[in-house]
């Protein structure tokens, strides 16, 4: 199953993305989601296949969501994931002596 997908980024939340089928555009995205997401900003288009690897999403789940509901919402990583990647020096910078 090959799908051409448009990916939009959220102007409100860093690293939040909305995947939609390019042919459908945003018409299948629920109205209630857009106030939370903000006005979608087109990032890029991508051909999705079951064999394709995505950095932070399960391709099977993305394709299932596109078929069943017409969109897939990629949430930003948890704050803890950001903190784990900071150098120890930055994590201790404001520690009391």
UniProtKB/Swiss-Prot annotation:
It holds the Pfam family YcgL. Gene3D superfamilies: YcgL domain (3.10.510.20). It comes from the Bacteria. InterPro entries: YcgL-like_sf (IPR038068), YcgL_dom (IPR027354). Residues 3-87 form the YcgL domain. This is YcgL domain-containing protein PP_4590. It comes from Pseudomonas putida (strain ATCC 47054 / DSM 6125 / CFBP 8728 / NCIMB 11950 / KT2440). The lineage of its organism: Bacteria, Pseudomonadati, Pseudomonadota, Gammaproteobacteria, Pseudomonadales.
